[in-house]
């Protein structure tokens, strides 16, 4: 009978078994990559809001600016504007789609100044809002399908009008900041102007 080197040399067999029984060693992978601090803060805030079961945390300046303010880019008339921007900016309420949302093409500082304008009735006349003195371009998003993420579908409406907002006092910075965008009211098609009380007046 022919003998193999393993059967003729037991020591060789033991060495081979020793190699096979050693714990598997994985090569260490360098996963130390830098992430911008603002992106990490946004991600942590998103996870906290996503898991939160109690009342929604009051909005901060950074949150309002990130979710509402937009810059020139995709045409505001684009049919999928809301679907893409709401997903990109993580505009959700916990695990549900928001029923409506506004994107405004303006600087945050300009939006903040509206908090000190005259009061006018909000949409549906429920509360008092502050209204912008000038016209602002933006997009109104209205939920049409689904209620839970990620299946939210919106219809987009381009608007150019007066912004109605509610404001809240933020203790950390000791000033009023925009709280919610209540409406973006388009002016009448016919010629009109605003009087000192912020009311539309039609010339005779």
Curated annotation (Swiss-Prot):
Its main location: secreted. Glycans are attached at residues 130, 142. Disulfide bonds join 97-152, 115-167, 122-129. InterPro entries: RNaseA, RNaseA-like_dom_sf, RNaseA_domain. GO terms for cellular component: extracellular region. GO terms for molecular function: nucleic acid binding. Residues 1-26 form the signal peptide. Keywords: Disulfide bond, Glycoprotein, Secreted, Signal. It is found in: Secreted. GO terms for biological process: defense response to Gram-positive bacterium. Belongs to the pancreatic ribonuclease family. Does not exhibit any ribonuclease activity. This is Inactive ribonuclease-like protein 9.
